Design a protein with these regions (language model features):
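Divalent-cation-coordinating short motifs within acidic/hydroxyl- or histidine-rich contexts, strongest
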Residues: 1-115, 124-153, 158-163, 170, ...
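C-terminal helix of von Willebrand factor
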Residues: 177-206
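Short secondary-structure transition/capping segments
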Residues: 164-169, 192-195
């Protein structure tokens, strides 16, 4: 089955089977869906890695804002998109390259590969598996991603200077310099421009 054919419920169920940080006693379903019926299916799909800016923006614009944040799932799939073991889901064009390449040096003495994830939230993580906690799950995923050599940038938008969302973004970032806290649209634009420049610098250095 191609990635485009996998809807969010199928991906959720598949990811659950490989979720190494699922706590004991947690089942594979959300405590509740934003809609009134617990039997409804999430309508959003996961888009594989792509350089198509127009398609990416259109996909993001298709997500409705319903006041809930399943941050652990966003973090989880950021990892899976970079993980070569998930190549059969995303397809050959979007398959993550081997982790070993990040420890191999090119002729300039630089890593042959950088795996980079950018996580953003505008609120606390408050949608989770029954019996689990989205914030705890997300932080554990971040720890494991960094252990694999993935560089994590985090961006908080209007999350204040303290609280669960702030702490999660701060802890998930690779270093304090990889954490951005934007209080308005202009600061958000600057944060992503700065991240883009840093990533571009890494590529140009090779």
């Amino acid at each position: 089955m191609s990635a485009s054919a996998l809807d969010s419920l199928q991906l959720l169920e598949r990811s659950y089977r490989y979720d190494a940080v699922k706590p004991n006693g947690a089942n594979g379903f959300f405590t509740h869906f934003p809609q009134s019926s617990g039997t409804c299916r999430p309508s959003a799909t996961v888009m594989p890695l792509s350089a198509d800016k127009t398609a990416l923006k259109s996909h993001v614009d298709s997500f409705p804002g319903l006041g809930g944040t399943a941050g652990h799932l966003g973090t989880q799939f950021a990892w899976y998109m970079l993980d070569p073991d998930w190549g059969s889901v995303w397809g050959s064009q979007s398959k993550g390259l081997p982790y070993a390449m990040a420890t191999e040096l090119n002729e300039y003495g630089k890593p042959r590969l950088y795996k980079i994830a950018v996580l953003m939230t505008d609120g606390e993580y408050n949608r989770q598996y029954s019996g689990a906690d989205s914030t705890t799950q997300a932080r554990e995923f971040c720890t494991r991603m960094k252990a694999e050599g993935i560089v994590i940038y985090t961006v908080g938008f209007e999350i204040g200077e303290s609280g669960s969302a702030y702490d999660t973004m701060q802890q998930c970032a690779s270093t304090s310099e990889h954490f951005y806290n934007a209080s308005n649209g202009e600061e958000l634009r600057i944060a992503f421009r700065d991240i883009a420049m840093q990533v571009s610098t890494l590529r140009l250095a090779e």
